[in-house]
Amino acid sequence: YSPALNKMFCQLAKTCPVYLRISSPPPPGTRVRAMAIYKKSEFMTEVVRRCPHHERCSDSSDGLAPPQHLIRVEGNLRAEYLDDRNTLRHSVVVPYEPPEVGSDCTTIHYNFMCNSSCMGGMNRRPILTIITLEDSSGNLLGRNSFEVRVCACPGRDRRTEEENFRKKEEPCPEPPPRSTKRVLSSNTSSSPPQKEDPLDGEYFTLH
C-alpha cells in the first residue's frame, strides 16, 4: 500500500488484508461492503468485472463467489456476493466484527481475481475499491476508498508510480541566466534579456 498515492498494489488472487478503524461501535447487524468502480468518469457507469479468460478459469475453489466477481473475501463463510438491481455493480458484504482483543482495527482479507491489464476486463483502466459500513437497513454509516492495481510486480510498480508522482509535484527549476555577448556602440542601446518565469509545478490532490 502506498500512502502517498492512496493506492494498493497486489498480485492476482493473493491475500490483501484491509484494516477498518471506526470511531465508535456500530449498531447490531452492521455490515461491511466492498465494491470496485472505475476511477475515470468516462468509465464510471461500466461494471468492473473479471476478464473472460479468468471467468472461464474458475473452479470449485471459488466457493460462494460468482465467477464474474472481481473482489472476494477470504476465509469468511458469511460473505454474500451481490449484484445491484439498478446499476448491476458487483459487491461483497460481510457482517461487521469488532476488533480482536489488543487491536483497534477489524481485519478483512480480500482477493482481487483479475489483473488490471487483462483485455476484456479492466484493460488497464484504474479502479477504486469503495469500502462502506452499513446498518441492517442499508443506511450508510461510514465510507472510504483507495485505488487498486493488480499486477505481477507490485513492489516495482509502486516504486515507479511513487517516483513519477514526486516528479509531478516538484516545480520545474528556474533556468540559469543566459550569458550574452554585446557589441558596445555609441549610438545603440540594448535592453537586458527578459527573465523567464519558472514553470508552475503540477499538484494533485488525492481523495
From Swiss-Prot:
Start-end of Basic and acidic residues biased regions: 159-171
GO cellular component, one term: nucleus
Residues bearing the modification Phosphoserine: S58, S145, S191
GO biological process, one term: apoptotic process
Domain of life, source organism: Eukaryota
Residues the record lists as Phosphothreonine modifications: T160
Residue segments, region Disordered: 159-207
Compartments (UniProt record): Cytoplasm; Nucleus; Nucleus, PML body; Endoplasmic reticulum
Cofactors that this protein relies on: Zn(2+)
Predominant subcellular localization, coarse grouping: cytoplasm
Positions bearing N6-acetyllysine: K181
Motif (Bipartite nuclear localization signal): 181-197
Chain residue ranges for the region called Oligomerization: 201-207
Annotated InterPro entries: p53-like_TF_DNA-bd_sf, p53/RUNT-type_TF_DNA-bd_sf, p53_DNA-bd, p53_tumour_suppressor
Keyword Coiled coil included in the entry's annotation: no
Covalent cross-link site, Glycyl lysine isopeptide (Lys-Gly) (interchain with G-Cter in ubiquitin): K167, K168
Residues the record lists as N6-lactoyllysine modifications: K14
Keywords: Acetylation, Activator, Apoptosis, Biological rhythms, Cell cycle, Cytoplasm, Cytoskeleton, DNA-binding, Endoplasmic reticulum, Isopeptide bond, Metal-binding, Mitochondrion, Necrosis, Nucleus, Phosphoprotein, Repressor, Transcription, Transcription regulation, Tumor suppressor, Ubl conjugation, Zinc
Biased composition (Polar residues): 182-193
Chain intervals for the UniProt region annotation (Required for interaction with FBXO42): 1-112
Region annotation Interaction with DNA: where it falls in the sequence: 149-156
Keyword Acetylation on entry: yes
Family per similarity comment: Belongs to the p53 family.
Disease: p53 is found in increased amounts in a wide variety of transformed cells. p53 is frequently mutated or inactivated in many types of cancer.
Domain-level remarks: The N-terminal and C-terminal disordered regions undergo liquid-liquid phase separation (LLPS) following homotetramerization and activation. Post-translational modifications, such as phosphorylation or lactylation affect the ability to undergo LLPS.
Protein name as catalogued: Cellular tumor antigen p53
